[in-house]
Amino acid sequence: MSRPEHIAPPEIFYDDVESKKYSSNSRIIEIQTKMAERAYELLAIPETAEGLMLLDIGCGSGISGDVITDAGHYWIGCDISQHMLDVAIDREVEGDVMLRDIGQGFPFRAGSFDAAISISAIQWLCNAEKSHHNPRKRLHTFFQSLFNVLTRGGKAILQFYPENSAQIEMITASALRCGFSGGLLIDFPNSSKAKKYFLVLFTGNNNIMPSAKGVEGEEYEQQEEEDSNEVKYSNRKRDRRRVTKSKGSAQHKTKEWIMNKKDRQRKQGREIKNDSKFSGRKRGPKF
């Protein structure tokens, strides 16, 4: 399936039809909300803190902004798609929204925001949508402007979908050159579906990196990718137990084989039942 940034520029891709999915498609809303909640969690804002000002980069229809509102803070969101902002206005979000190309920086005074989050937006900066666009220059402008509008000691959590390792390196290096400290955090790194990339950036010295999820086989609730709306069907033939040609019975799996498979699936982030004394034990004859 083609990546959205390969189909059209964001202001064209997120047209009236695509934008309305973000207010009517429960699956998209659920995924966006969970990623925004994770981004806010990584900010590690003390529960005693109230009324902070946050910047929502690529705010879209305001789903991630709702998470900020629920946490008791104020926010300003910017997005390049007028249609997405129209949906946010129709939803009567609490924050203020503005039309803005983040590759041109932010029109705010220095130190205006205590923190910033972004969900599925900054990978668009790696594409040259116009002849005069230079991805490296646009990334530099973005990160330098973001560094300036954050307070000293502020933090930014940017979730994104990198196309390859070179893109990760280009984004991370650009952020560090602009004065940020921090790095890349990957939730569920062993799972192709649940893997999520977060760029964790600090403007001050309090730069302790948070812990990633799923590194030690932590269980998770499996979810589809944000931009995938396809219905998945199980392959019944593949799911059936393999039958040997000679005896016509299911091929026997040893206890060691079963335990190794369960351990591998846990590392991939799948929900696997806990081991018991019956795990891998041969069952008696059926009635």
Curated annotation (Swiss-Prot):
Main location: nucleus
Gene3D superfamilies on file: Vaccinia Virus protein VP39 (3.40.50.150)
Region (Disordered): 214-287
Bias (Basic residues) ranges: 234-245
GO cellular component, one term: nucleoplasm
Keyword Endoplasmic reticulum: no
Protein's job: S-adenosyl-L-methionine-dependent methyltransferase that specifically methylates the N(7) position of a guanine in 18S rRNA. Important for biogenesis end export of the 40S ribosomal subunit independent on its methyltransferase activity. S-adenosyl-L-methionine-dependent methyltransferase that specifically methylates the N(7) position of a guanine in 18S rRNA. Requires the methyltransferase adapter protein TRM112 for full rRNA methyltransferase activity. Involved in the pre-rRNA processing steps leading to small-subunit rRNA production independently of its RNA-modifying catalytic activity. Important for biogenesis end export of the 40S ribosomal subunit independent on its methyltransferase activity.
Protein name per its UniProtKB record: Probable 18S rRNA (guanine-N(7))-methyltransferase
Phylogenetic classification of the source organism: Eukaryota, Amoebozoa, Evosea, Eumycetozoa, Dictyostelia
